[in-house]
Curated annotation (Swiss-Prot):
Cellular localization per UniProt: Mitochondrion; Mitochondrion inner membrane
Gene, per the UniProt record: ATP2
PANTHER family in UniProt: ATP SYNTHASE, ATP SYNTHASE SUBUNIT BETA, MITOCHONDRIAL
Gene3D superfamilies found in the cross-reference section: 2.40.10.170, Bovine Mitochondrial F1-atpase, Atp Synthase Beta Chain, Chain D, domain 3 (1.10.1140.10), P-loop containing nucleotide triphosphate hydrolases (3.40.50.300)
Family: Belongs to the ATPase alpha/beta chains family.
Residue span of the annotated presequence: 1-33
Protein name: ATP synthase subunit beta, mitochondrial
Amino acid sequence: MVLPRLYTATSRAAFKAAKQSAPLLSTSWKRCMASAAQSTPITGKVTAVIGAIVDVHFEQSELPAILNALEIKTPQGKLVLEVAQHLGENTVRTIAMDGTEGLVRGEKVLDTGGPISVPVGRETLGRIINVIGEPIDERGPIKSKLRKPIHADPPSFAEQSTSAEILETGIKVVDLLAPYARGGKIGLFGGAGVGKTVFIQELINNIAKAHGGFSVFTGVGERTREGNDLYREMKETGVINLEGESKVALVFGQMNEPPGARARVALTGLTIAEYFRDEEGQDVLLFIDNIFRFTQAGSEVSALLGRIPSAVGYQPTLATDMGLLQERITTTKKGSVTSVQAVYVPADDLTDPAPATTFAHLDATTVLSRGISELGIYPAVDPLDSKSRLLDAAVVGQEHYDVASKVQETLQTYKSLQDIIAILGMDELSEQDKLTVERARKIQRFLSQPFAVAEVFTGIPGKLVRLKDTVASFKAVLEGKYDNIPEHAFYMVGGIEDVVAKAEKLAAEAN
């Protein structure tokens, strides 16, 4: 450490005289020196490298705290390690956030004095960063002046908002049948090719339009190809604007990265989202794809650290690890972080500890169905399998609850009659059942909706439908006010006025 100019060899006599005549100066100086001593970086050296695990020995008795970030200078830049265990004899065991190839024993390690910190703020919008906050989109450094540690406590009970509020998405099927809680956690179930990516993009777009909020997409164990495709699609649809302000920040911890990076990248994305909530009062949408891979990475890290596994080979701290992430996703009196988490269910076993632990935290589930997508109905949300704890008369109001229940009842009746229709035809049904089937088919098509982000592909302008309009429209259909309108007029429209306009247009074309 370089001492201040005051304390050089030539000025010791002057300093001694000043010290005797001014005790206050001496006290202040001692405090300054003590502070400087405490801020001196702790350095150590690598003693063992075992895959993603690196042991570091420190000469000083003072060791870096658990979760502190350590740095090693490498020819490629820097390698960040996170302290996981204190082994004794001044040695700590760390998890590497990148590959350890080429790392040798004896290399110098520097303690940063705090956890991994990442850039936050509007400068991150439209950019792709990795777990340690470095840009990976080849568009230069992120010019943010603010950085936040990825490890933080959840908001206190006093800060949290206790009222249950709906976060309007503008998507009819979601708002009506499985509404999202503001500051809630939603599980998104969907296989390949059912419109999951487009659904996510539309949510990002609608949150920006309806609430002026931002979104953070976190790829946990994401395939590099999928991440690249998502980035390119977002640029094409205008969600990411390279010239103006974008609506989303992307954080990727790719599938080929070490388990340490995949276990922490969700926290990096959450930290960026928390800044928009706490400092800018925004309603932020946080996407995590895939939450199972977060658990899987934690399991790998746990095994590398030598912990005894629990059921099915998962880490013994599974519930704690999940809770540390999920409890930070909440509503405060300033804003909210609403999370949509893609959930992979291993071998379709819902009792597997990983998805079972996730389900305990979810407020709603949105299920994308291949059967519905094959009918050409998009978004392909299954109205009978999707659920929400907010669909309660005390939260959404009696009218909304009654309409949603009647819609589900009508669709369920139609589903139970489909086998009879397939074998015997519509003629064998009673008049009441025929009417129910006709209305159910209209409702099924009315649950479709043109998306703004898909306009470049479909040529149909996107529609954002307000919740009160959605409830009123479906109530009118259930009451039979539009029984005279053909069912194809209900396909790919916004509100009920669009149905009427489309029906008039179709009638004019027919004449």
